[in-house]
Amino acid sequence: MASKKLGTDVHGTFSYLDDVPFKIGDKFKTPAKVGLPIGFSLPDCLQVVREMQYDFSLEKKTIEWAEDIKLIQEAQREAERKAEEAEAKVNSKSGPEGDSKVSFPKTHNTATMPPPINPILASLQHNNILTPTRVSSSATKQKVLSPPHTKADFNPADFECEEDPFDNLELKTIDEKEELRNILVGTTGPIMAQLLDSNTARGSSGAVLQDEEVLASLEQATLDFKPLHKPNGFITLPQLGNCEKMSLSSKVSLPPIPTVSNIKSLSFPKLDSDDSNQKTVKLASTFHSTSCLRSGASRSLLKPSTQSSASELNGDHTLGLSALNLNSGTEVPTLTSSQMPSLSSVSVCTEESSPPDPCPTVTPLNFSVSQVPNMPSCPQAYLELQALSPSERQCVETVVNMGYSYDCVLRAMRKKGENIEQILDYLFAHGQLCEKGFDPLLVEEALEMHQCSEEKMMEFLQLMSKFKEMGFELKDIKEVLLLHNNDQDNALEDLMARAGAS
């Protein structure tokens, strides 16, 4: 062990290593001095070089070997040239018979050649194994040089990759929005007008529709006869103000009717039946929704033909059709006009039977196959729908026909305007996030703040839900997340500071 003290001229009068013992390794120590023996002296290099005698014998032998190799190569080339000349003469005189004679002098020439001085260098110049065999006849040469014929049973296509039918799948995809737009273009105004005339002629005189706006909107109502998606098992008729809506189970299987003579005699088939039965159901539901409209500003309640109990479906009060005995879910025979009351006594709202409480007039909307849209149940949404312009109302009706509710479509249109594609994108993103379990109010906040980034929306919703469970206010959570760009730690510190200050 040793102790080391640094000089006072560097660190002053004291050092941090004073009286501190530490060990120094051998490799850091100064090497010991080695003394040369007495009389040892190194020779002078220049004197050694001057006294050295170098004869360059190896270099001279190498040059001689190179010259001998050149002579051997020239002798080989001369022998080959003479052999070719002799072979050409023999071929011109005797033809193929001279082949065996030519090979002997060639081998004799190669045998009489002197052996190479350096076999290693000589072997690098020529390789007898790879020397091609010489032939005499030109026909034989053409036969040898011609490519080999492929076998008849060989098919190169057997070794190629099989075409995957899914490779071209992307080329066959369609634009869903364009297809939906094309589907919603067709109209069935004349069909609805004929149906309305035939039914109102059989009804009472007080059930005649006098509202020209209702008739005009009825002619413009569009119907799609191709199912867009499988419904939820119910055919729901539209709810009109105080009129209670009727629900029909999809399990009911009734025989089809060739002519539509009475609203009670219509058959409501299964939802996966053919297009003609689906057309009958749609025409009936559309006519029923428009026949309950009054020319003034009121509607009457829907009266059942016999006693029936009100059931509740999806949160809305519905009144079943006891005349069709749909509660049992079994098949019921077709009811004719002689067995059932006329259309006017059941569903057409007359002026005398209208309740004292007036309701605003509703313009009939477009209905699709898979779902008949409900009128907005919220009075505020109902009044907002009436305040829209015709183009805005048409935009709302188009999106509602795709299966969305009025409230969601109106909220989306307030944020995105009348652009149907942007409304559909907004509703699709909103529905996906709600299906993942997020609060709809938080989803709307996320779509408003981070609509362009799905990753930031998910991060924002997760932090909002987490901070909301901690008990913080939504307003403060939104402010701090926007301020700190979804930074969890900084946002939590800010929220804690605000909570402590309050």
From Swiss-Prot:
- Tissue expression from the record: Ubiquitous. Highly expressed in heart, liver, brain, kidney, spleen, skeletal muscle, stomach, testis and lung.
Name of the protein described by the UniProt record: Ubiquitin-associated protein 1
Q: Does the keyword Protein transport apply?
A: yes
Question: What keywords tag this UniProt record?
Answer: Cytoplasm, Endosome, Phosphoprotein, Protein transport, Repeat, Transport
Q: How does it assemble?
A: Component of an ESCRT-I complex (endosomal sorting complex required for transport I) which consists of TSG101, VPS28, VPS37A and UBAP1 in a 1:1:1:1 stoichiometry. Interacts with PTPN23. Interacts (via UBA domains) with ubiquitinated proteins.
Q: Name the PROSITE patterns for this protein.
A: UBA, UMA
Interaction with ESCRT-I: region residues: 1-95
- Where is it located? Cytoplasm, Cytosol; Endosome
Q: What is the lineage of its organism?
A: Eukaryota, Metazoa, Chordata, Craniata, Vertebrata
GO cellular component terms attached to this protein's record: cytosol; ESCRT I complex; plasma membrane
Q: What are the recorded Gene Ontology BP terms?
A: protein transport; ubiquitin-dependent protein catabolic process via the multivesicular body sorting pathway
Which gene name belongs to this protein?
Ubap1
Stretch list, region Disordered? 80-117, 135-156
Q: Where is the composition biased (Basic and acidic residues)?
A: 80-100
